């Protein structure tokens, strides 16, 4: 029997995964609510606020889908049919890919927004949101096509006893693909993800280099009156770098665990750990925005104050 089929017996993994999903859903919901309220309350809303709300919505949908899948992993209330398996697994894989795309494009949009007037990126500022939206839609279509094989490789197979079938949930299993089909889908996905991470690193490096030059110029002009307080641009760049570094570390760790899982024949512990690691970014990233953006912090404080005074 496939070892991952025993995943539902691990209470610690069950508690950890459901806790992660619950916290992530709550944090992303708060972030979406805060940004939507600020967008509705401002005369000229910033494009970055709209995109962060959309970014959080993507992560919220990912965690909700993962929560539904986790229910069938640990406490199945009824066996799913093949259509339910294929739809939920496909949606989950699509949202995971869109999270990578949204993270990359958020870094690019932030870089364009914070770039100085003398930068070559200035010409993209007025239409940056439109360009980012078009790029996201294009990547969405790509992910939908690259993940289409799941509709033929995911089946409802409750009594999993064959070694060549890979466990997904208590109801769903993955049929092994031929080497040609596997390569046909995995190679384009690997290239696309490498390009997105490379673009993310390039945008982060650009902002670090720009702020380093800006700091040197400020030190040259104001050697005797330097302020230790970080500027909004510096705080935003720190947020970018923190999110990007955290995402890349988790992405690499996810790949390492995945290959280890394949090597050790799909062990239940590695499978559970991989699920937790792959959804950690969606849970932690909203807290980074909430803690680093003063506008969100002040808004949440004012909301709490109003609730207390009622």
Swiss-Prot record:
Residues 1-20, 72-93, 156-183, 260-268 are extracellular. It is a multi-pass membrane protein. InterPro entries: GPCR_Rhodpsn_7TM, Vmron_rcpt_1. It is found in: Cell membrane. The chain crosses the membrane at residues 21-41, 51-71, 94-114, 135-155, 184-204, 239-259, 269-289. It comes from the Eukaryota. GO terms for molecular function: pheromone receptor activity. GO terms for cellular component: plasma membrane. Disruption phenotype: Mice lacking all but one V1ra and V1rb gene (12% of the V1r repertoire) show a lack of chemosensory response to a subset of known pheromonal ligands and changes in maternal aggression as well as male reproductive behavior. Putative pheromone receptor implicated in the regulation of social and reproductive behavior. This is Vomeronasal type-1 receptor 53. It comes from Mus musculus (Mouse). The lineage of its organism: Eukaryota, Metazoa, Chordata, Craniata, Vertebrata.
